[in-house]
Amino acid sequence: MAAEVHPTAVVHPGTVLGDGVRVLEHAVVGKQPTLSPRSTAKREPLAPAVVGAGTVISTGAIVFAGSTLGARVIVGDQACVRERVSVADDVVIGRGALVENDTTIGARTRIQADAYVTAYSTLEE
């Protein structure tokens, strides 16, 4: 089953969408981050985002380049998944949650609405 992308959603070039992925209204997938001139973060372009089969990127959500979402993940409305984040299968990221860069989230983890997950975190099953 092909991925379904709403006409108002933005899927950046190179992004990999698995079978049955749904990208809903005004969502953005595969965006390269824009760094401040004073930022000490790495400046090289990131690999494309990868979204596993059956995953839903909800309305207004953002998934940055360099991140990988497993199968059957739900990214809630207006949630944000920053660069170099690895999300395993069957994870729920609640509405308005922010997952900062370089984070690993284990299978079947539930991140509640409006949660803030700091950079370089590991959340296990």
PLM region spans:
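Left-handed beta-helix
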Residues: 6-7, 12-13, 18-19, 24-25, ...
